[in-house]
Amino acid sequence: MKFAVLVFPGSNCDRDMYNAAIKSGVDAAYVDYRETTLDGFDGVLIPGGFSFGDYLRSGAMASVAPIIKEVKRFAKEGKPVLGVCNGFQILTEIGLLPGALLHNDSHLFISRNETLKITNNQTPFTHLYVKNENVVYPVAHGEGHYYCTDEIYRELNDNNQIILKYTNNPNGSYEDIAGIVNKEGNVCGMMPHPERALETLLGTNSGVKLFESMVKSWREQNV
């Protein structure tokens, strides 16, 4: 398995994503936003940061980058796509995930570890976790308030698309939502950073199982 780690101007978690992929026992390579193909890759990781300086709004300018057309094709083919923080914002901007990310209720940038609950462990991103297991991931965002309409929330809930919730909502996210998947289950977006949760020495290794879940799921289907 080989992950593509997308890199936009202003990305600052691309190395963390790359490291997470390598640590999970597979290959990875950086892919510039100006590229137009993802041939040779089996999964896509869209990192956090401030793509294009967050001008217009978070993820808006990245949503029209050349590589995005290929990301959409990749997702349509059922291949795994993970977007974290700014990556989640990009996935909502391009319509691969519903809802939007707004300014935190506090209007402050939040940077700390948060305890979250795995609400669905039947996805390629979470199946090595136990349902309702508490995990600790760092958060680092100013626009992490997940918003959706009541109708979209009902759909997310009915389709079991909500995979991660805050136990102590730091940003005002609707119904404590921290991470979701698309209806097909192969596209995942979350505001917390599992790629920064790989080492107990640094505070938490809760993120290891997310990347190992992705790899195990892919191998079960392709090897």
Swiss-Prot record:
Keyword Heme: no
E.C. designation(s): 6.3.5.3, 3.5.1.2
GO biological process entries: 'de novo' IMP biosynthetic process
Main subcellular localisation: cytoplasm
Any Pfam family the entry gives: GATase_5
Subunit field text: Part of the FGAM synthase complex composed of 1 PurL, 1 PurQ and 2 PurS subunits.
Organism: Staphylococcus epidermidis (strain ATCC 35984 / DSM 28319 / BCRC 17069 / CCUG 31568 / BM 3577 / RP62A)
Signal peptide range in chain numbering: none
NCBIfam families in the record: FGAM_synth_I, PRK03619.1
CC annotations in GO: cytoplasm
Function, in words: Part of the phosphoribosylformylglycinamidine synthase complex involved in the purines biosynthetic pathway. Catalyzes the ATP-dependent conversion of formylglycinamide ribonucleotide (FGAR) and glutamine to yield formylglycinamidine ribonucleotide (FGAM) and glutamate. The FGAM synthase complex is composed of three subunits. PurQ produces an ammonia molecule by converting glutamine to glutamate. PurL transfers the ammonia molecule to FGAR to form FGAM in an ATP-dependent manner.
Compartment(s) where it occurs, according to its Swiss-Prot or TrEMBL record: Cytoplasm
Name of the gene: purQ
Gene3D superfamilies: 3.40.50.880
Keywords: ATP-binding, Cytoplasm, Glutamine amidotransferase, Hydrolase, Ligase, Nucleotide-binding, Purine biosynthesis
Family matches, as PANTHER family: PHOSPHORIBOSYLFORMYLGLYCINAMIDINE SYNTHASE SUBUNIT PURQ
Catalytic activity: N(2)-formyl-N(1)-(5-phospho-beta-D-ribosyl)glycinamide + L-glutamine + ATP + H2O = 2-formamido-N(1)-(5-O-phospho-beta-D-ribosyl)acetamidine + L-glutamate + ADP + phosphate + H(+); L-glutamine + H2O = L-glutamate + NH4(+)
Domain Glutamine amidotransferase type-1: start-end pairs: 3-223
Pathway: Purine metabolism; IMP biosynthesis via de novo pathway; 5-amino-1-(5-phospho-D-ribosyl)imidazole from N(2)-formyl-N(1)-(5-phospho-D-ribosyl)glycinamide: step 1/2
Classification via InterPro entries: Class_I_gatase-like, PRibForGlyAmidine_synth_PurQ
Domain of life: Bacteria
Full protein name: Phosphoribosylformylglycinamidine synthase subunit PurQ
GO molecular-function terms, A-Z: ATP binding; glutaminase activity; phosphoribosylformylglycinamidine synthase activity
Catalytic residue list: 85, 193, 195
Record's keyword annotation contains Ligase: yes
